[in-house]
């Protein structure tokens, strides 16, 4: 069995809100769902679903949903009733733009707010989270990590093509914070996420943690 599982889908996710279907959904997870299995209700809550275009558009959303599974609500919200002793996130404004917000327009979008950190620390001390501390089964075929960063193998245009079927509007340091793609319907540029880690952001530079830095010799060359 697993502690948490995240499923990535290339399908366009949607949900019902106030009786209307909205497609403005990129991920879903249960708050405090890690390790939770209710055999009486045949329900498993330790799951998350994330939409990904195939060009790493779901990476940040995956981290956001894992935050939910580890007990963090959206910044600005109160804790759910079943986590009544959790500090919640009422004192951390949504507009600050940390990981548990979708207002992620600065480098803070890859960091947890103080509220998120406190909530996850609280959850990890509960008995619910006990499965996260057991010794995992060893595998005779462990998965090997990639030798290059994700963006090193995908140009900025390719990332926008996967997301919106158009090209990137900019090819400079701005893409590390927000990847702007051309939006045919309005004739303007639109961004929903940063370029993938390792994406080229200038001559001899690439994106790392939402910053445009000189490319390290430890990483492969990226594409523009």
Regions found by a protein language model. Name each.
Residues 1-224:
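Extracellular (secreted or membrane-anchored) zinc-dependent metallopeptidases
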